[in-house]
């Protein structure tokens, strides 16, 4: 499928650089078939039915952007996938400096050695410490890896803002941004409504922001991300659906993991491992009935995903409406609630 079919023009002033305060005061565009309604995130409980189940991604963003030195020169790396207790795949710039065996100094006594170098600025780093000690060093010296379209340095506010309130599993280098809208009050209102919730973990990688550089989706390579869906969670989601409830994925990351764990029989199974699932129009959904998601970049794999889920022409029209109404886009922006369209137009 041609990538340019997923292109659109977005005014730069609609790219949110800070989140709504409070989180659940953001706007929500409801898209059901051909109809659209302009609402707020706080309206979500009334849009769901008792017995529905919300599926959240509980990954926690780590300070994955590091500034270091190689000799007299500087280098910046963004970790994107843990490959061992002391090893991470990363994107680096300038990448030409990262040759196997080279040592990067991030702080006094905190270093990493280049174990391997890949393509397109990728490399594998082996740190001088592992596990909790490595996480502590990242917390001390790393920066929150804000998306490249937020054109400002990260600051202390981002340590809280770019994290869901229920994050608990260290490992993401990008936030599951639909979840940023939830507050304790909103979760309580959903519980009072009779909507249950389940947690899955997909450690979002920096590859989520990589542009699609090819002209055809068949030629695009997705980066793998590590996820876990426990047997207990699978049982809870299957039970909710069997009782007539809808499965509502909070974010594309939760959706991608759910779809990775579900077969054509629509039974969700335990999952632990990597997924590089790439969802484009024509994909047959097995796990998810509704999707809450923010507004995505043109030509991105995530805009392709929502087009596959809710219909390509419907999403083009919905995005045109959102732009005309001044919705805020991307990670810190507003959100939408989409229903699955059996007719994928």
Swiss-Prot record:
GO biological process: queuosine biosynthetic process; tRNA wobble guanine modification
Assigned GO CC terms: cytoplasm
Catalytic activity: 7-aminomethyl-7-carbaguanosine(34) in tRNA + S-adenosyl-L-methionine = epoxyqueuosine(34) in tRNA + adenine + L-methionine + 2 H(+)
Compartments where located: Cytoplasm
Pfam families: Queuosine_synth
Keyword S-adenosyl-L-methionine (UniProt): yes
InterPro entries per the UniProt record, alphabetical: QueA (IPR003699), QueA_dom1 (IPR042118), QueA_dom2 (IPR042119), QueA_sf (IPR036100)
Primary location class: cytoplasm
Keyword DNA damage found: no
Pathway linked to the protein: tRNA modification; tRNA-queuosine biosynthesis
GO molecular function annotations of the record: S-adenosylmethionine:tRNA ribosyltransferase-isomerase activity
Enzyme class, first EC level, given as a word: transferase
Alphabetized UniProt keyword annotations: Cytoplasm, Queuosine biosynthesis, S-adenosyl-L-methionine, Transferase
Residues making up the signal peptide according to the UniProt record: none
The enzyme's E.C. designation: 2.4.99.17
Primary role: Transfers and isomerizes the ribose moiety from AdoMet to the 7-aminomethyl group of 7-deazaguanine (preQ1-tRNA) to give epoxyqueuosine (oQ-tRNA).
Assembly: Monomer.
Family listed: Belongs to the QueA family.
Matches recorded under HAMAP family: QueA
Protein name (database record): S-adenosylmethionine:tRNA ribosyltransferase-isomerase
UniProt source species: Rhodospirillum rubrum (strain ATCC 11170 / ATH 1.1.1 / DSM 467 / LMG 4362 / NCIMB 8255 / S1)
Lineage, top ranks: Bacteria, Pseudomonadati, Pseudomonadota, Alphaproteobacteria, Rhodospirillales
């Amino acid at each position: 499928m041609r990538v340019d079919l997923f292109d659109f023009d977005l005014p730069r002033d609609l790219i949110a650089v800070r989140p709504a305060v409070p989180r659940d005061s953001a706007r929500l565009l409801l898209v059901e078939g051909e109809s659209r309604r302009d609402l707020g995130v706080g309206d979500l409980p009334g849009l769901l039915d008792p017995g529905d189940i919300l599926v959240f991604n509980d990954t926690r963003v780590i300070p994955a952007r590091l500034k270091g030195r190689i000799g007299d020169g500087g280098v910046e790396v963004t970790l994107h996938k843990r490959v061992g207790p002391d090893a991470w795949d990363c994107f680096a710039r300038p990448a030409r400096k990262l040759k196997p065996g080279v040592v990067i100094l991030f702080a006094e006594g905190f270093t990493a050695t280049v174990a391997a170098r890949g393509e397109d600025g990728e490399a594998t780093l082996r740190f001088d410490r592992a596990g909790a000690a490595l996480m502590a060093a990242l917390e001390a010296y790393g920066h929150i890896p804000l998306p490249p379209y937020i054109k400002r340095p990260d600051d202390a506010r981002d340590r809280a803002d770019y994290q869901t309130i229920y994050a608990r599993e260290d490992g993401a280098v990008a936030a599951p941004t639909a979840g940023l809208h939830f507050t304790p009050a909103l979760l309580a209102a959903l519980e009072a409504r009779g909507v249950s919730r389940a947690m899955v973990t997909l450690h979002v990688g920096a590859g989520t922001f990589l542009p699609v550089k090819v002209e055809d989706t068949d030629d695009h390579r997705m980066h793998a991300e590590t996820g876990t869906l426990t047997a207990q969670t699978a049982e809870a989601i299957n039970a909710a659906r069997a009782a007539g409830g809808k499965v509502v994925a909070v974010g594309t990351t939760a959706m991608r993991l759910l779809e990775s764990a579900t077969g054509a029989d629509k039974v969700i199974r335990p999952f632990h491992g990597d997924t590089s699932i790439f969802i484009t129009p024509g994909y047959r959904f097995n796990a998810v009935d509704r999707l809450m998601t923010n507004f995505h970049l043109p030509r991105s794999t995530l805009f392709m995903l929502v087009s596959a889920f809710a219909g390509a022409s419907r999403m083009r029209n919905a995005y045109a409406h959102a732009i005309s109404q001044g919705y805020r886009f991307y990670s810190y922006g507003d959100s939408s609630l989409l229903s699955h369209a059996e007719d994928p137009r």
